[in-house]
Structures are given as C-alpha cells and as structure tokens.
C-alpha cells in the first residue's frame, strides 16, 4: 500500500495517449512489493515492469477511447498490467 501511495503522491502521472492509460502507478507498485518480498534483482524488477507496461498498453489500446468514456482505463487495464508484472516476477507463463 505504501508503494501505491508513493507512486501517486505528486500527481505527476505518466500517460500513454493511445491507451489512455497511466502505467507506472499500477505496474511499479505491485512489482516493487513483490520484488522486495522475493529478494529479486533490479534487473528482474525492470523486466517485469516492462512486461506490465507492454500488456497494459496493449490492453488499453484494444479497449480504445470509447472505453474511457465509461471506465478509467488505468483501473481496468491496470489490473491486468499489474498481474502481468507480478506474474513475470513469479515466473508464471501466459497461461497461468
């Protein structure tokens, strides 16, 4: 929870315009928490974060701007992005 609060405290979010998505807040917070809990390397944290960004942006682009009229894409695509980042750290395959 502390990572999530810290990632949003300055209200200076990154944005991917095509996905209408703020990836850093939803990817780095859970990835950092899991990396700390596992004692993972910085390289593992970064590669997991890249996986989270890739998945979140692709899902956000798939959902499109019409999705944003009703839902906040960071909350919807972000849950999948967070799962991808943490899953990467855990060594899960896409099926898992």
Please report, for each region that a protein language model flagged, where it lies by residue:
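N-terminal core-entry segment
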Residues: 1-96
């Amino acid at each position: 929870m502390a990572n999530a609060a810290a990632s949003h405290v300055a209200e200076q979010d990154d944005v991917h315009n095509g996905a209408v998505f703020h990836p850093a807040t939803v990817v780095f917070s859970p990835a950092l928490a899991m990396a700390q809990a596992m004692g993972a390397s910085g390289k593992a944290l970064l590669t997991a974060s890249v996986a989270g960004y890739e998945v979140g942006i692709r899902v956000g682009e798939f959902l499109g701007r019409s999705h944003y009229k009703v839902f906040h894409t960071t909350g919807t695509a972000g849950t999948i992005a967070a799962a991808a980042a943490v899953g990467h750290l855990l060594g899960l395959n896409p099926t898992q």
